[in-house]
Amino acid sequence: MSDYVYYQGATFTVEWYQDASGHMKAKKYYEGLPREEQKRLDDIVAYLADSPLGTRLPKTLYNEEDSENKIYAFKPKDHRFFNFVTVGKKIIIIDAYRKHSQQMTRKDINLLKTVIASRNDYLVRVKGGNYYERHA
């Protein structure tokens, strides 16, 4: 299994996004968490990836953060892992951060903007045939 594949579920494959340089910011963030906090995300991801299409998780665990660009967040405790669903039943985790307040701060909103740009980068690179081919 490639180092960018996080979880291969019955319904979805969950992957870490790689930028053009091969960096995986969300994976690096995840690896810096204590094991019990990693396990919390592991459990949420496995549940969603193994569930039938159309399964909805509670908003306390998985929430739509940007409806226009279909950006979601896995929400293990006070961490947020931005992601989106794409063709081939893939969930791509782009970036992550530790939430500090009830509402999204300006810093959180700026991160969301970079997540949207990364999503667009992923889609362009996949369409151009130089995302998976480059990292194979």
Describe each model-derived feature in a short phrase.
Residues 1-78, 88-90, 98-136:
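Basic, Lys/Arg-enriched alpha-helical interface segments
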